[in-house]
């Protein structure tokens, strides 16, 4: 779905390592596909070699029908077009509630109404990147702010009809959780779900070891094809999601502008932080918090993650001489 701000998604590239799978009776099966404007890969220990791709596709299609900004018939598209007859489904209500929670705990740094600013700066669908004028920014800020939106009797109510919602900053994490809960409901104990780089893992891999997940080094302009792994973590019963500013930026008059926009000012955050990896009990919060931290910056982002229970962060930032440096919260364990 979600090419517009994930752009919030494409730079979150994680690489699952040491989880090579094989099919067969009772063996590990790997399935993959395309949804939400990106790829997904899922590995699970089967009962009898069963292929679950059709069921997974069905879950993700239902998810897109709720929240895809590219599906003209989705609930999100109709709501953004000010169709007031729409009664939101469970997907929409839950992602809205999570977004409101993140909006409140972040001091409005996390905001799914920010897409007009993203488009204004040229980080959206058409990729016409430029530094807008202050007047242009001010005019757009008038209809940015999740506190201008409520759900009343199942319907979305906006204080300004120009407000649009897009949940790219946490929706893929939410879809990871939805698929993971489905695996749990069927009794699967060992699996790894990755959608657009957002990961939830449970149990062990085909080698009988805890799943190992790689975190990319934030090299400017790097792609998924030429990524370099910065660190590796073991993961089971938790999610790991990343965000960074090294794949979607432009330079104008010697100044680097990244796509991580502060919804309260309308400008990209100027900070030494290059990327962050967040571990949390669920992917919707890990995903949303990763984006939030990039907007808040290194110091404030570290403080936020450190204050949250069962939540850890790994931060990669630039030193004054341009080298990479790292810091992490106390509970974030990196493999040696």
Pin down the residues of each PLM region.
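Mature catalytic core of soluble alpha/beta enzymes
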Residues: 2-6, 19-336
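Hydrophobic h-region of N-terminal signal peptides that target proteins for export
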Residues: 11-20
């Amino acid at each position: 779905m979600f090419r517009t701000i994930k752009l919030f998604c494409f730079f979150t590239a994680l690489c699952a390592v040491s989880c090579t799978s094989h099919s067969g009776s009772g063996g590990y099966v790997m399935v993959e596909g395309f949804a939400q404007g990106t790829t997904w890969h899922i590995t699970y220990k089967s009962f009898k070699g069963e292929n679950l791709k059709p069921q997974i596709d069905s879950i993700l299609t239902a998810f897109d029908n709720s929240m895809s900004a590219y599906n003209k018939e989705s609930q999100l598209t109709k709501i953004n077009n000010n169709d007031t007859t729409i009664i939101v489904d469970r997907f929409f209500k839950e992602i809205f509630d999570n977004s409101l929670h993140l909006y409140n705990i972040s001091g409005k740094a996390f905001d799914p109404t920010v897409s007009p600013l993203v488009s204004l700066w040229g980080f959206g669908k058409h990729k016409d990147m430029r530094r807008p004028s202050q007047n242009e920014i001010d005019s757009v800020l008038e209809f940015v702010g999740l506190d201008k939106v409520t759900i009343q009797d199942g319907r979305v109510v906006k204080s300004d009809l120009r407000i649009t919602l897009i949940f790219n900053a946490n929706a893929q994490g939410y879809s990871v959780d939805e698929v993971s809960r489905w695996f749990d409901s069927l009794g699967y104990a060992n699996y790894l779900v990755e959608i657009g780089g957002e990961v939830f893992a449970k149990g062990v891999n085909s080698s009988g070891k805890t799943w190992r997940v790689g975190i990319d080094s934030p090299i400017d302009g790097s792609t998924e094809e030429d990524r370099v792994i910065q660190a590796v973590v073991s993961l089971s019963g938790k999610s790991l999601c990343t965000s960074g500013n090294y794949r979607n930026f432009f330079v104008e008059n010697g100044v680097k502008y990244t796509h991580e926009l502060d919804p309260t000012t309308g400008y990209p955050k100027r900070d030494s932080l290059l990327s962050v990896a967040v571990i949390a009990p669920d992917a919707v919060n890990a995903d949303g918090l990763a984006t939030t931290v990039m907007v808040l910056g290194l110091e404030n982002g570290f403080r936020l993650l450190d204050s949250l229970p069962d939540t850890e962060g790994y931060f990669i930032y630039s030193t004054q001489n341009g080298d990479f440096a790292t810091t992490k919260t106390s509970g974030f364990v990196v493999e040696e």
